[in-house]
């Protein structure tokens, strides 16, 4: 390969892979660059920190089980995945929490059990048509995630009386739970959590989760503070933090500020509530709004 432009931010963007029938350019961080080099060389790899890669144009792969396959096995077809993010975790990904077969509209593990195991995370939100005939509150909550997640998730609704408990609008079957827009924030911020992230947030302990956890906020969100998880509003002289469509990702041990910024306006994946028990990274999947 040749260098078309020298970069300054530590990320590397790679053109479409000509051997595949689809369009699959990608942009990868430093950990994923090491992963990519090891994969290309067929070399051993130790994933010693989280990694993030973008494939927002989609992609196609020859196999979900063999990292070295150059074409699909006899009788099989190329695997096509729409716009997605790829994630690395030092502990890998638990097949009890994520599918190990390709999915168009929910996260799945690629190359499970190999040194190159990673999570494929589709980021196309459910369409209005796919939601079906549901209430406005259900529609808002379901807008947080892709169809494969939200159609089978537990959907929570706001309390019917002031000070009451949230109500269940839909009983789920896939372990995910989706919450409605927070009335206390000025933005629209429904979210869908997998079992790991939901338990981590509920316990106030996202840095000590037993394995990698994931949340969707594809409708975007707004937060009081990027440093204080207990803030009840923005600090004096500051404004609400608005983040467009994004993922939230947590891993055991949290994230190192040497590799991820804490600047919520950077446009890069950034650490929210760094150094606290609720630390996680926010991964924008569209351009950040400019102030």
Model-predicted segments: where are they?
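Primary mode marks residue(s) on the alpha4-beta5-alpha5 output face of response regulator receiver
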Residues: 1-291
């Amino acid at each position: 390969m040749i260098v078309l432009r020298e970069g300054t931010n530590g990320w590397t963007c790679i053109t479409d892979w000509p051997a595949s029938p689809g369009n699959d350019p990608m942009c990868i961080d430093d950990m994923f660059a090491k992963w990519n080099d090891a994969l290309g060389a067929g070399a051993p790899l130790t994933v010693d920190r989280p990694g993030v890669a973008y494939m927002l144009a989609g992609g196609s792969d020859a196999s979900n089980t063999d990292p070295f396959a150059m074409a699909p096995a006899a009788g099989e077809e190329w695997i096509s995945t729409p716009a997605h993010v790829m994630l690395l975790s030092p502990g890998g990904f638990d097949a009890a929490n994520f599918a190990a077969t390709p999915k168009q509209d929910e996260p799945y593990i690629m190359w499970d059990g190999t040194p190159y195991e990673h999570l494929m995370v589709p980021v196309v939100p459910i369409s209005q048509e796919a939601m079906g005939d549901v209430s406005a509150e259900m529609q808002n909550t379901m807008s947080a995630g892709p169809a494969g997640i939200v159609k089978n998730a537990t959907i929570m609704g706001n309390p019917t009386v002031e000070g009451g408990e949230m109500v269940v609008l839909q009983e789920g079957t896939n372990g995910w739970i989706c919450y409605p827009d927070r009335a206390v924030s000025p933005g629209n911020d429904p979210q869908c959590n997998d079992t790991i992230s939901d338990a981590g947030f509920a316990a106030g302990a996202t840095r000590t989760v037993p394995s990698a956890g994931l949340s969707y906020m594809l409708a975007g969100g707004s937060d009081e503070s990027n440093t204080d998880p207990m803030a009840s509003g923005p600090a004096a002289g500051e404004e609400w933090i608005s983040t467009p469509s994004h993922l939230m990702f947590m891993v055991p041990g949290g994230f190192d500020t040497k590799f991820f910024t804490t600047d919520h306006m950077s446009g890069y994946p950034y650490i929210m509530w760094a150094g606290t028990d609720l630390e996680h990274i926010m991964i924008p999947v569209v351009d950040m709004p400019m102030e």
